[in-house]
Amino acid sequence: MRITELFNIQSIALDSAAADQAQIIDELVELQATHGNLTDKAAYKAAIYAREAEASTYVDNGITVPHARAACVTRPSLAALRLKTPVQYNADDDGKTDLLFMIAAPENGSLHIDMLARLMQMLMNEDFVAKLRATKTPKEFLDTIDA
């Protein structure tokens, strides 16, 4: 499965004004809901917060990848959010974030581990990340991932 198959155009938001972790998670959960794969948004949001309580999902270079497995997720999917202004996502993070990818995965199965590994491999390429930050539309963002 290609990573772009886990997105849809409606699950990508660019230039968000979200200013803190709560607003970011709210917006990303709404973007995830565009897939129609969350049977309970509140339960999924609770799963994200529980995962964040274990350890920060801030990666590096302004990138954060919140993710959770939950019974309310019917199939794996990705959502992306790019912020207008970088923010401190978690008090323990070393830097501010402006580029976030949320992975939703069903409770059973391990596809989310493959998704996370492939996404992380892509995000380690600074040129690729710079291209994502320069995109103007969700379609261009998705095309950049697919290139």
What role is predicted for each listed range?
Residues 1-147:
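Cytosolic covalent-transfer regions centered on His/Cys nucleophiles
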